[in-house]
């Protein structure tokens, strides 16, 4: 992936996350549930003052510091390894974008806007940035596991 494409991808992903969050805040009342696809997923506007699954509620400064450290480490690793694997770059782009997307909410609003509720499973309500983080971390784990086991592709 060319150097210029990386920041463009990060900004585009952050933009999508922030646009969805702004749309939800403008169009859905707090705690309102809208069945988007019945039985599959709903949109539910929540203000999450903790981490994933609403743990560590009201620990804003802890999350700000943790996010800065994680984004800093991911950026450093990306700069050092951007020429290695497209999959590695993609995983880091997702982690950085998701971290920054939720960081913007936490600093600007004091909470993170969550909205995606999976109706077919008992699971926490999450947002687009959380999806980026989850996919990015899982992809990174898979890449590192494959490297550790000598399966280079």
Swiss-Prot record:
Keyword match Glycosyltransferase: no
Functional pathway: Protein modification; lipoprotein biosynthesis (signal peptide cleavage)
A GO CC annotation given for this chain: plasma membrane
Transmembrane segments: 61-81, 85-105, 125-145
GO MF entries: aspartic-type endopeptidase activity
Highest taxon in the source lineage: Bacteria
Active site residues of this protein: 114, 130
Biological process per Gene Ontology, one example term: proteolysis
Keyword Manganese: no
EC number(s) per entry: 3.4.23.36
Membrane-related topology note: Multi-pass membrane protein
Keywords: Aspartyl protease, Cell membrane, Hydrolase, Membrane, Protease, Transmembrane, Transmembrane helix
Intracellular or extracellular location(s): Cell membrane
Major site of localization recorded for this protein: membrane
Reactions listed under catalytic activity: Release of signal peptides from bacterial membrane prolipoproteins. Hydrolyzes -Xaa-Yaa-Zaa-|-(S,diacylglyceryl)Cys-, in which Xaa is hydrophobic (preferably Leu), and Yaa (Ala or Ser) and Zaa (Gly or Ala) have small, neutral side chains
InterPro entries for the chain: Peptidase_A8 (IPR001872)
Summary of the function given for this chain in its UniProt record: This protein specifically catalyzes the removal of signal peptides from prolipoproteins.
Family: Belongs to the peptidase A8 family.
Name of the molecule in the record: Lipoprotein signal peptidase
Lineage, opening ranks: Bacteria, Bacillati, Bacillota, Bacilli, Lactobacillales
